[in-house]
Amino acid sequence: MVQASGHRRSTRGSKMVSWSVIAKIQEILQRKMVREFLAEFMSTYVMMVFGLGSVAHMVLNKKYGSYLGVNLGFGFGVTMGVHVAGRISGAHMNAAVTFANCALGRVPWRKFPVYVLGQFLGSFLAAATIYSLFYTAILHFSGGQLMVTGPVATAGIFATYLPDHMTLWRGFLNEAWLTGMLQLCLFAITDQENNPALPGTEALVIGILVVIIGVSLGMNTGYAINPSRDLPPRIFTFIAGWGKQVFSNGENWWWVPVVAPLLGAYLGGIIYLVFIGSTIPREPLKLEDSVAYEDHGITVLPKMGSHEPTISPLTPVSVSPANRSSVHPAPPLHESMALEHF
């Protein structure tokens, strides 16, 4: 009897400890920054699994894959990623887009390392997943050798490499320009004062944008246009056995898909804001209490799932002190997705 009673008390105690641990984990996961980190991690993982899987089909068996299939895989992978995380982090899935939004004041800099870390880990895990799923097919195709160049090269499944007809600096300009086009169009798609995508279609339209870039302009460099898409899988291939040639190939090409997209996204965002955003007539925002405007995080350009104070320098704000005491602050706007972040 004594033993049975002690056993029951021990069981109840272990259950209480278990529930306490679960509650603590849930509390941590509900923190905004943690949720945004996990959102970037999962959305990037989803995008990269579909994208890299489509490349594996094209490289390993032409019967099942094609260049069009690669573009569709990455494009609709982006669409699925936006659905996974659009209402939590904005589903950037791209360190260059995160950098541009931070540099242009749309996202606080403190979120930059959190978002990029989530993206890099998701991309790395996606590369490991594709390697595991296609391991036997890779070895069969290459005769058991993990090659970076040559007719049985398989490193290109995971990262982009400079083709023979391109020079390093032409490739740099190509990557910067394509990423600039991406960012410019993303701002257009989500600009509520211009001609944005219809509510609920943003994810699909952004996926189509990626497909268009690929089928029209992707031949020269494989259109990485995303440090989070290229560098983590490249690091994985180095660890998995492809060797240091994954970094040295193409005149040390590896750094170009990291640096060029950052520059391109920033310039593309500036070009849109200066030449398009600043020329659109915008009605003054009717906020009577400027203090409430600053304190409650009211954003002129509506964005989903984020209450960070984001005031566009291009939007005039009309403030009247006449009725400060009688006016209640307006709530944050949520009519559109936060995909200006993408």
From Swiss-Prot:
Membrane protein topology class: Multi-pass membrane protein
Result after altering G264V: Loss of glycerol channel activity; loss of water channel activity
Tissue: Detected in the sperm head (at protein level). Detected in white adipose tissue.
Residues in compartment: Cytoplasmic: 1-36, 86-89, 104-111, 189-200, 276-342
Localisation per UniProt entry: Cell membrane; Cytoplasmic vesicle membrane; Lipid droplet
Any one GO MF annotation of this record: glycerol channel activity
Record GO cellular component, one term: cytoplasm
First-listed, main subcellular location of the protein, grouped into a coarse class: membrane
Record site: Important for permeability to glycerol: Y135
A GO biological-process term: glycerol transmembrane transport
Site (Selectivity filter): residue numbering on this chain: F74, Y223, R229
Placement of sequence motif NPA 1: 94-96
Matches recorded under InterPro entries: Aquaporin-like, MIP, MIP/Aquaporin
Modified residues (Phosphoserine): S20
TM stretches of this protein: 37-54, 68-85, 112-132, 171-188, 201-217, 254-275
Effect on the protein upon substituting Y135A: Strongly decreased glycerol channel activity. Mildly decreased water channel activity
Short sequence motif NPA 2: positions: 226-228
Catalysis: reaction(s): glycerol(in) = glycerol(out); H2O(in) = H2O(out); urea(in) = urea(out)
Activity regulation info: Glycerol transport is regulated by pH, with the porin being permeable to glycerol at pH 7.4 but not at pH 5.5. Water permeability, however, is not influenced by pH. Inhibited by mercury ions.
Pfam families found in the cross-reference section: MIP
Record's comment describing the protein's domains: Aquaporins contain two tandem repeats each containing three membrane-spanning domains and a pore-forming loop with the signature motif Asn-Pro/Ala-Ala/Ser (NPA).
Quaternary structure annotation from Swiss-Prot or TrEMBL: Homotetramer; each monomer provides an independent glycerol/water pore. Two homotetramers on opposing membranes can dimerize, forming a cell-cell junction. Interacts with PLIN1.
Purpose of the protein: Aquaglyceroporins form homotetrameric transmembrane channels, with each monomer independently mediating glycerol and water transport across the plasma membrane along their osmotic gradient. Could also be permeable to urea. Mediates the efflux of glycerol, formed upon triglyceride hydrolysis, to avoid its accumulation in adipocytes and to make it available to other tissues. In the kidney, mediates the reabsorption of glycerol, preventing its loss in urine, again participating to energy homeostasis.
The name this protein goes by in its record: Aquaporin-7
Source organism (scientific name): Homo sapiens
Biological classification of the source: Eukaryota, Metazoa, Chordata, Craniata, Vertebrata
Gene name of the encoded protein: AQP7
